[in-house]
Amino acid sequence: MVTADSTTDIPELFRQATAQGQAKQYDSAARLFERAFTLDPDGPLADKSLFESAEMYDVDGKHEEALSRYEQVARRFPSSDLDRVARVRALRLLTYLEHYERAGELADLTAAKYKDLLSFDQLAVLSARALSRVAADDDTQAELAIGKARDIIERESLDGAGRVPAELAPVYFALGELRRVRAERIHFVPVPASFGAALEQRCQLLLDAQSAYSDAMRAYDSHWSAMAGYRVGELYQKLHEELMQVPAPKAADTERRRQLFEGAMRLRYSILLDKAKSMLDHTVAMADRTGEQSPWVLKSRQARDAIIQATQAEQAALARLPYTREQLQAALDSFSAGHVPP
């Protein structure tokens, strides 16, 4: 084929691009494949050239570039043998890049078109659907998608002891997200009629969410691990923040009793900041070790710094109070029992 700017025929250009890819010169290979597609966008190698361009960008870590080309394959070549795999890869990238609304839309279209998806492809569809539904506050549909994904995982025995396949990370992350948003719907201001029951329910959901996020980390994917680690730290930090806003009870009717209540609350729940910092320390250390540089790592560093400052403020506030830890604990026990501390 002769063009205005090249005398290289398409098969030869395709071979050159393939050689570049095999030599791990992925960016160069991607550009050559894309040139082959551009020169002959309706030719016999058009769909494969565009797909290979996407794949080269994908392995080179250029996710947005890869995503746009996978999506283009699906749009331009819906009858191609590459359509199915292009859709699944686009789904994984949409989920990875947190484009959850688009991921949900593509998941529904893909599931409607292909009724015989393989297990891992089904997991890509279901995790994308679940995350899009969580983002839309649709608990019912999110839980349904996660349940179907977990059924596949169990049926195929995909989750054994230790490391799990990378395809499971978004499923478990979605489960963590669902449990997280349910936990954070439980508030303590105004003080609920049964404060103890509300706190117990939120703590249980927090622990359940942490368990799911921990399962996501078992894929040993630094991106998903950073996201999950940040979320766990955030769960503890937010719970502490909200508990510190709980107003003093009516029994705290003097300045001394209000000080006792404030100090007792700070003392009892300071452990939440310790747990948050521990998880964020772990997340930042993982990022340093693996070279992960996603926005979630920056958020983890910033959150850790904020928690260090909050911990110092808590310690200073406790030090200013003219009471021992034993006195504060006794006061909190009295308030919790509905009694007035002396």
Where are these regions (language model features)?
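Acidic, polar-rich low-complexity tracts and alpha-helical solenoid repeat scaffolds
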Residues: 1-342
